[in-house]
Each structure stands twice: as C-alpha cells, then as structure tokens.
A protein has these predicted regions:
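Helix-turn-helix
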Residues: 15, 22-57
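Hydrophobic alpha-helical connector segments
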Residues: 61, 75-107, 155
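N-terminal intrinsically disordered/low-complexity leader segments
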Residues: 1-11, 193-198
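Amphipathic alpha-helical segments used for helix-helix packing
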Residues: 88-91, 102-123, 127
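Generic hydrophobic, amphipathic alpha-helix propensity
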Residues: 12-21, 37, 62-66, 70
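Hydrophobic/aromatic-rich alpha-helical bundle segments in the mid-to-C-terminal region
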Residues: 122-131, 143-198
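Hydrophobic/aromatic residues within well-ordered alpha-helical segments
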Residues: 62, 66, 70, 85, ...
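Short hydrophobic clusters on alpha-helical segments that form packing/core surfaces
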Residues: 16-24, 96, 159
C-alpha cells in the first residue's frame, strides 16, 4: 500500500522533531539552528516552513518529544528494576542517576540537559519547559506516594542538579562518584526501612 501525501508529510514532520529533540539536549536551545536540523533530517532548509510556523514552534515540539522519549525510557528502566523487587523510588533514583546517564546527553532527561537555558527562552518555550519540570516532580511524587509536593520538588531538584554537575565533571571516576554519592544519600533519606517521608 502506498503512502498518501499527508502520511509522508507527517512522517517527515516526525523525523524533523526527532532530530530537534536530540539536538536541543546535545547543544542547548541556542545551538539548534533550523538549517542544521533540516540537514540532519535529510531535508532542505526551504522545506521547514511547510511544517512549522517558526523555530520557536519547533523548539516547543522538540522539548515535548524529548520529554516523552525520556519519560518512556525511565518507565522502561523502572519496569526492569521493579521486576527485581525494588521500590519505585529506588528504581527511579537508580535509573535517573545511573552511570549511563553521564554519556547519554542527547537521549536523557531534557530538564537536566536544558535547565540552565530554560529561563532565557521565549514565553512559549518557557511554558513548555515548566510543563516538563512539573511532570518530573509529579513522577518523583508518584514514586514517593507519601511525600509532599515540596519534598518531591526537593528530590527532583537534587536529581537534576546532581546529573548536571556529574556531567560537568565528565563520564569519568569523578562524575560516577558524584552520582553514586547522591544515589546513596537519596536512598538513605527516602528509601531506608522505617523511613517516614513527609
């Protein structure tokens, strides 16, 4: 069965968004140019406006896609760890602060990759960024069902900040040590037997 023009256009649109979702995590918002994204997607720069009204519209969609991809990857990791019988919180901490996150900038959490850039963006991109942050906090709260929203916010901030600093140190012993220390501290604080979370 042949694809319709609308199907081809949608597939092309999805390819552009996928490329941009990786690019914003790899280069930050400022490092994402329309021409580069289109070239990496195997398209000409001129075709961009058949899919998006503006670069800002692309960034919003790319951030949403990056968040969905990261969320799906974390969910898969949680399911694998849950099969081992660990708590949801332990699974989340182990997945988010796993050593493999040091080298997976373009496929990892967009909040950790872009938090420093978020305040300097347009209103639309900042709004999409705020949605990602709220979803991260909600995910932490779901893993710690007895925790307050404030506690979930602190834990989310610890996860993001630790990952950012560990990446700044690099995919080396120092970066891995920082992740390990944060995992241990978070699990001791919130996942130890008899721990009361507020």
């Amino acid at each position: 069965m042949s694809r319709t023009p609308d199907t081809r256009k949608q597939e092309t649109h999805e390819r552009i968004v996928d490329v941009a979702a990786r690019a914003i995590r790899r280069h930050g918002y400022a490092g994402v140019g329309v021409a580069d994204v289109m070239k990496e997607a195997g398209l000409t720069h001129g075709g961009f406006y058949a899919h998006f009204d503006s670069r800002e519209a692309l960034l919003v969609e790319a951030l949403e896609r990056a968040g969905r991809q990261s969320g799906e990857a974390i969910t898969r990791a949680l399911e694998r760890r849950a099969a081992r019988g660990v708590s949801a919180f332990r699974a989340l901490v182990e997945a988010y602060l796993g050593d493999e996150q040091l080298a997976s900038l373009e496929t990892g959490c967009p909040v950790a990759a872009l938090a420093g850039d978020m305040p300097r963006q347009s209103d639309a991109v900042r709004a999409a960024s705020a949605v990602r942050v709220r979803r991260l906090v909600a995910g932490v709260q779901a893993a710690l069902p007895h925790a307050s929203r404030a506690t979930a916010s602190v834990v989310a901030g610890t996860l993001v900040g630790t990952l950012q600093l560990a990446r700044a140190l690099g995919a080396n012993a120092d970066g891995r040590a920082m992740l390990s220390a944060a995992r241990k501290a978070l699990l001791q604080q919130y996942d130890a037997p008899g721990t009361a979370v507020r």
